[in-house]
Amino acid sequence: YKESAISYYVTHGLAETEMRPTEIYWLHEVPKDWKETKLKYLLQKHKREIPEDAELLICSNSGDVKKRGDSKLGLVASSDDIYQGVHKGDLLIHGMDTWHGAIAISEFDGMCTPVVHVCTCNQSKRFVAYYLKMMAYTKVYKAISNGVRQNTSDFRSWDKVANLLIAFPSLAEQEEIADYIDGIVDSVNRMVSDYEMQIEQLHEMKHRVILDVITGATDIRNVQIPDYEFVDEEEPEEDSDIGSDSDEDETEEQED
């Protein structure tokens, strides 16, 4: 539901409106007042200096930015050549896992690998991030790119990313759409978290019951086991061959 909601609202908006054909070939139509352009006119790619004591950040396939343990700048050899700086609020686009939705706005200062495009945006970063994720959910990246390994899309070239087409409304409407999608995402994530917690509690309860029975903490000597009747499953009879000799004999007897 989350992916379908994102895909719908970033291409249709919140209100019903007149639609028009689009030059973006993976979209059938867009709201008539929306503009179309290439990403390079909305995003600016940066090569930032690495902050002191920067933590290594991962632009994950789950669509968020995570800290990678205790990996510090001082523990990484030749880090100036390998990594790049990230500022809180930067839009990150993973050049190899774009197809899987590895696109996110960083909540941290830190550093990341150069395969990730670190960008700022002159529009709503949240709207653009959701739009780019929509392209992953609808498999656009897989259709327009050949990965260098299985299950990848190769967007390491910034020119390839910069020339992707996007349709977008006014900045105010972008923020409204992003706010609405944020609400859906938060609601779904809370629901999933609640279910995961309930499942974990049931697993713990099951393990506790088993352990209590095995250790004797629960006395099961007087537990009544209900009677049941064992029913042996019969093997299915083999179907007779059509046109067998027995069938022919029966036919001849009927004719006689």
Residue ranges and their predicted role:
Residues 15-18, 106, 151-156, 200:
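Short helix-capping and inter-helix turn/linker motifs at the boundaries of alpha-helical repeat units
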Residues 23-24, 37-88, 234, 240-256:
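Sequence-specific dsDNA recognition surfaces
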Residues 49-72, 91-115, 126, 130, ...:
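Short, ligand-facing micro-motifs at secondary-structure edges
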Residues 21-51, 167, 171, 175, ...:
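Non-catalytic DNA-recognition/assembly elements of restriction-modification systems
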Residues 96, 110-115, 149-175:
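A short glycine-rich beta-alpha junction/loop motif
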